[in-house]
Amino acid sequence: MKKLLVSALAATVLSFGIGSGVTIASAAEPQAVTKSNILTMAAVWKQTAAEYRALYYQGFNIAQKYVDEAVAKKKKKDKPLAVITDMDDTVVIHDRYWAHLIANGEEFFNDPVWDKYIPTNSLLPAPGALEFLNHCKEKGVEVFYVTSRDQGEGTYEMALGNLQSLGFPYADKEHLTVLVDTSNKEPRQKEIAEKYNVIVKLGDSLNDFQRKYYIKKDFEERNLMTAMDKDLFGTKYIIMPNPTDGHWIAAIFGQSEPEDTEENRALWQKTATRNAW
């Protein structure tokens, strides 16, 4: 996950620690509003916009259509059916984490806070996710979760606990893969594809589909590559909305979690104004 700018708007958002039994930091008085509010706007959009939710519903509806078609066409001799999905911002969302950062004056992604947030199970199911995943189970389609995280010792158990806390199907060691040392999901996805007929892949980052999209400091090349593969989106790849973080940031900064520096702020500004009239 990545970075965020400060806004007094988030003072109305409840701290994600409520009911978790874990205190991360008190949501102090909201910080002064700054002129730069691009990422704050993205966080507000994620927390309030019906359009944000509609995009999730749309994605899961499309995926379910392909699941139903695959089930109807499957023959006994065929490989079993499966869906491969990312976790974060695909089937689970972290609005409370972003709200916490803003309420505490954070302007960029904060790893220590993220690592404290994860074990609280304060995440939420993405709109439509639970219904879709349960539909897969009802149809006999297995779901494999492939995610990349690193909270140190206990990383895997935390991720598994996140899924189980939300009542997700297939939340077990057979179906969950947590990559700690790499974000390259292709090797694991290929292993799954050897035994299963993978209907669709779901993710919020292009890197969730193929490693070739993980391009640093060249968002134009990444956009071009996406255009070349346009027929895969909505058919084999189901992309979910995420304006606050993802590998698209690495295409600008060279890393997915750039530090809060004057140089990086200047690059944000330069990139945001590149098409100004």
Task: Mark where each language-model region is.
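Sec-exported extracytoplasmic/periplasmic mature domains
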Residues: 68, 72, 97, 134-142, ...
